Amino acid sequence: MFKWYVVQVFTAQEKKVKKSLEDFKEASGMSDFIQQIILPSENVMEVKKGEHKIVEKYIWPGYLLVKMHLTDESWSYVKKTQGVVEFLGGGAPVALSEEEVKNILADLEEKKSGVVQKHKFEVGSQVKINDGVFVNFVGVVSEVFHDKGRLSVMVSIFGRETRVDDLEFWQVEEVVPGQESE
Protein backbone atom coordinates (compact mmCIF):
# COMPACT_ATOMS: atom_id res chain seq x y z
CA MET A 1 0.00 0.00 0.00
CA PHE A 2 1.32 3.44 -0.97
CA LYS A 3 1.72 5.93 1.85
CA TRP A 4 3.37 9.31 2.22
CA TYR A 5 6.63 9.62 4.14
CA VAL A 6 8.78 12.63 5.02
CA VAL A 7 12.42 12.22 4.07
CA GLN A 8 15.08 14.49 5.53
CA VAL A 9 17.79 15.53 3.07
CA PHE A 10 20.80 17.83 3.26
CA THR A 11 19.68 21.45 3.12
CA ALA A 12 20.35 23.09 -0.26
CA GLN A 13 20.38 19.66 -1.95
CA GLU A 14 16.62 19.13 -2.08
CA LYS A 15 16.34 19.44 -5.89
CA LYS A 16 19.39 17.28 -6.49
CA VAL A 17 18.12 14.49 -4.23
CA LYS A 18 14.63 14.64 -5.76
CA LYS A 19 16.12 14.38 -9.26
CA SER A 20 18.35 11.46 -8.21
CA LEU A 21 15.41 9.57 -6.73
CA GLU A 22 13.28 10.19 -9.84
CA ASP A 23 16.03 9.42 -12.38
CA PHE A 24 17.20 6.18 -10.83
CA LYS A 25 13.87 4.70 -9.74
CA GLU A 26 13.21 3.54 -13.32
CA ALA A 27 16.69 2.08 -13.83
CA SER A 28 16.72 0.31 -10.47
CA GLY A 29 13.23 -1.18 -10.74
CA MET A 30 11.86 1.02 -7.95
CA SER A 31 9.07 2.58 -10.05
CA ASP A 32 6.68 -0.06 -8.67
CA PHE A 33 7.50 1.07 -5.13
CA ILE A 34 7.99 4.84 -5.42
CA GLN A 35 5.01 6.63 -6.90
CA GLN A 36 5.61 10.35 -6.34
CA ILE A 37 8.20 12.73 -4.88
CA ILE A 38 7.29 16.28 -3.88
CA LEU A 39 9.58 19.15 -2.91
CA PRO A 40 7.20 21.48 -1.02
CA SER A 41 7.72 24.99 -2.39
CA GLU A 42 5.94 28.24 -3.17
CA ASN A 43 6.49 31.15 -5.53
CA VAL A 44 7.63 34.26 -3.69
CA MET A 45 7.80 37.80 -5.08
CA GLU A 46 11.03 39.52 -4.08
CA VAL A 47 11.85 43.13 -4.80
CA LYS A 48 15.50 44.11 -4.90
CA LYS A 49 16.70 47.46 -6.13
CA GLY A 50 13.29 48.14 -7.63
CA GLU A 51 13.16 44.93 -9.68
CA HIS A 52 10.41 42.38 -9.09
CA LYS A 53 11.52 38.78 -9.28
CA ILE A 54 9.54 35.60 -8.63
CA VAL A 55 11.64 32.93 -6.95
CA GLU A 56 10.85 29.44 -5.74
CA LYS A 57 11.27 29.07 -1.97
CA TYR A 58 11.15 25.79 -0.12
CA ILE A 59 8.41 25.61 2.49
CA TRP A 60 10.27 22.91 4.44
CA PRO A 61 13.98 23.32 3.68
CA GLY A 62 15.71 19.96 4.01
CA TYR A 63 12.63 17.77 3.50
CA LEU A 64 10.91 15.87 0.68
CA LEU A 65 7.56 14.09 0.63
CA VAL A 66 7.74 10.62 -0.89
CA LYS A 67 4.69 8.51 -1.75
CA MET A 68 5.89 4.93 -1.68
CA HIS A 69 5.17 1.34 -0.81
CA LEU A 70 7.55 0.77 2.08
CA THR A 71 9.53 -2.46 1.86
CA ASP A 72 13.04 -3.25 3.06
CA GLU A 73 14.23 -2.81 -0.52
CA SER A 74 12.48 0.53 -1.19
CA TRP A 75 13.49 1.88 2.23
CA SER A 76 17.11 0.93 1.57
CA TYR A 77 17.01 2.46 -1.93
CA VAL A 78 15.80 5.84 -0.64
CA LYS A 79 18.07 5.78 2.42
CA LYS A 80 21.19 5.07 0.31
CA THR A 81 20.48 7.89 -2.15
CA GLN A 82 23.23 10.50 -1.86
CA GLY A 83 21.99 13.50 0.13
CA VAL A 84 19.33 11.61 2.10
CA VAL A 85 19.75 11.89 5.87
CA GLU A 86 16.86 9.75 7.11
CA PHE A 87 13.14 9.12 7.10
CA LEU A 88 11.19 10.95 9.79
CA GLY A 89 10.61 8.38 12.46
CA GLY A 90 14.24 7.26 12.43
CA GLY A 91 14.78 3.51 12.35
CA ALA A 92 11.08 2.82 11.77
CA PRO A 93 9.75 5.36 9.25
CA VAL A 94 6.36 6.76 10.22
CA ALA A 95 3.83 7.34 7.45
CA LEU A 96 1.78 10.53 7.45
CA SER A 97 -1.89 10.11 8.33
CA GLU A 98 -4.57 10.57 5.65
CA GLU A 99 -5.64 13.81 7.36
CA GLU A 100 -2.08 15.18 7.42
CA VAL A 101 -1.60 14.34 3.74
CA LYS A 102 -4.90 15.96 2.79
CA ASN A 103 -4.01 19.17 4.66
CA ILE A 104 -0.45 19.31 3.33
CA LEU A 105 -1.45 18.74 -0.30
CA ALA A 106 -4.28 21.31 -0.06
CA ASP A 107 -1.86 23.84 1.45
CA LEU A 108 0.71 23.16 -1.29
CA GLU A 109 -1.92 23.51 -4.01
CA GLU A 110 -3.03 26.85 -2.57
CA LYS A 111 0.55 28.13 -2.32
CA LYS A 112 1.44 26.99 -5.86
CA SER A 113 -1.61 28.73 -7.35
CA GLY A 114 -0.40 32.21 -6.47
CA VAL A 115 2.60 34.32 -5.62
CA VAL A 116 3.39 35.21 -2.03
CA GLN A 117 4.76 38.65 -1.20
CA LYS A 118 8.06 37.98 0.58
CA HIS A 119 7.84 41.00 2.82
CA LYS A 120 4.59 41.58 4.62
CA PHE A 121 5.32 44.94 6.18
CA GLU A 122 2.32 46.77 7.60
CA VAL A 123 1.82 50.35 8.67
CA GLY A 124 2.50 50.51 12.41
CA SER A 125 4.90 47.55 12.58
CA GLN A 126 8.37 48.05 14.04
CA VAL A 127 11.41 47.62 11.81
CA LYS A 128 15.17 47.96 12.11
CA ILE A 129 17.05 49.68 9.29
CA ASN A 130 19.98 47.53 8.10
CA ASP A 131 21.42 49.67 5.32
CA GLY A 132 22.06 53.29 4.50
CA VAL A 133 22.54 56.44 6.58
CA PHE A 134 20.11 55.33 9.30
CA VAL A 135 21.57 51.83 9.81
CA ASN A 136 20.63 50.28 13.20
CA PHE A 137 17.81 52.77 13.80
CA VAL A 138 14.54 51.20 14.91
CA GLY A 139 11.34 52.85 13.75
CA VAL A 140 7.70 52.41 12.86
CA VAL A 141 6.48 51.80 9.30
CA SER A 142 4.41 54.79 8.16
CA GLU A 143 3.76 53.83 4.52
CA VAL A 144 4.17 50.69 2.41
CA PHE A 145 4.41 50.61 -1.39
CA HIS A 146 4.20 46.88 -2.22
CA ASP A 147 4.18 47.56 -5.96
CA LYS A 148 7.56 49.31 -5.70
CA GLY A 149 9.01 47.19 -2.91
CA ARG A 150 9.59 50.28 -0.79
CA LEU A 151 8.41 51.77 2.48
CA SER A 152 8.72 54.82 4.73
CA VAL A 153 9.72 54.62 8.38
CA MET A 154 9.40 57.09 11.27
CA VAL A 155 12.53 57.09 13.45
CA SER A 156 13.35 59.11 16.55
CA ILE A 157 16.42 61.33 16.15
CA PHE A 158 17.34 63.39 19.22
CA GLY A 159 13.80 62.92 20.53
CA ARG A 160 12.17 64.15 17.33
CA GLU A 161 10.21 61.90 14.96
CA THR A 162 11.80 61.96 11.51
CA ARG A 163 10.48 60.28 8.39
CA VAL A 164 12.91 58.15 6.38
CA ASP A 165 11.53 57.67 2.86
CA ASP A 166 12.27 55.40 -0.06
CA LEU A 167 13.69 52.43 1.85
CA GLU A 168 13.66 49.17 -0.08
CA PHE A 169 12.26 46.08 1.64
CA TRP A 170 15.69 44.44 1.79
CA GLN A 171 17.07 47.45 3.71
CA VAL A 172 14.88 46.76 6.76
CA GLU A 173 13.86 43.80 8.89
CA GLU A 174 10.87 43.31 11.15
CA VAL A 175 11.55 43.67 14.85
CA VAL A 176 10.06 41.03 17.10
CA PRO A 177 8.33 42.72 20.07
CA GLY A 178 10.58 42.57 23.11
CA GLN A 179 13.79 42.35 21.05
CA GLU A 180 14.13 46.00 20.04
CA SER A 181 17.35 46.52 21.97
CA GLU A 182 19.45 43.91 20.12
UniProtKB/Swiss-Prot annotation:
Keywords: Transcription, Transcription antitermination, Transcription regulation, Transcription termination
Disulfide feature: none
Gene Ontology BP annotations: DNA-templated transcription termination; regulation of DNA-templated transcription elongation; transcription antitermination; transcription elongation-coupled chromatin remodeling
CDD domains, per the entry: KOW_NusG (cd06091), NGN_Bact_1 (cd09891)
GO cellular component terms listed in the entry, alphabetical order: cytosol
Keyword Ion transport: no
NCBIfam families for the chain: nusG
Function: Participates in transcription elongation, termination and antitermination.
Sequence similarity: Belongs to the NusG family.
Entry protein name: Transcription termination/antitermination protein NusG
Organism of origin: Chlamydia trachomatis serovar D (strain ATCC VR-885 / DSM 19411 / UW-3/Cx)
Lineage of source species: Bacteria, Pseudomonadati, Chlamydiota, Chlamydiia, Chlamydiales
